[in-house]
A protein has these predicted regions:
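Charged, amphipathic alpha-helical segments and their flanking helix caps
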Residues: 1-25, 43-147
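A short, hydrophobic beta-strand-centered structural micro-motif
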Residues: 30-39
């Protein structure tokens, strides 16, 4: 799951100048880190044949380490635009059916959202860390044959 999202984000135009890795970002500007925060089962149903259907949400965090010299409002605006461009791209790719598929059933109901982009911290050395929450909702079917 994490590798699918990593490969997907690696295509994002907003990340072309960023070195993306699995794990935490930084400390060098121009780096980003992606990791999974976990999976939550939102709903579970079992039919008479014993097939279990789960609606799940996987949550990921993407942290970006970008340059932000103290008092530089132009760079702050560029960084904010960078986050917004990434969120918009994820929404467009999902709407076009080009987002990664995480479940094994009902792909038409799958969603992928990038949201809550924010500045986490900035230091006097001219570096800022931004975070973005990425949420995937998908459906998983389990049968006796499902490993």
């Amino acid at each position: 799951m994490l590798q699918k999202l990593y490969a997907f984000l690696a295509r994002a135009p907003a990340l072309t100048e960023i070195t993306l890795a699995v794990g935490d970002a930084g400390p060098a500007p121009g780096t980003a880190g992606l990791w999974c925060k976990g999976v939550t089962v939102l709903e579970q149903r079992e039919n008479l044949l014993g097939i279990v259907r789960q609606r799940c949400r996987a949550e990921f965090t993407l942290r970006l380490c970008l340059p932000l010299p103290p008092g530089d409002s132009a760079t702050a605006a560029e960084n904010a635009a960078h986050l917004l461009a990434l969120q918009t791209w994820v929404a467009a790719e999902c709407a076009a059916g080009r987002a990664p598929v995480f479940g094994n059933a009902d792909p038409a109901r799958e969603t992928l959202r990038a949201e809550q982009g924010k500045l986490e911290r900035a230091d006097a050395g001219g570096t800022a860390v931004y975070s973005l929450r990425i949420r995937a909702e998908y459906t998983q079917l389990y049968t006796e044959e499902t490993p």
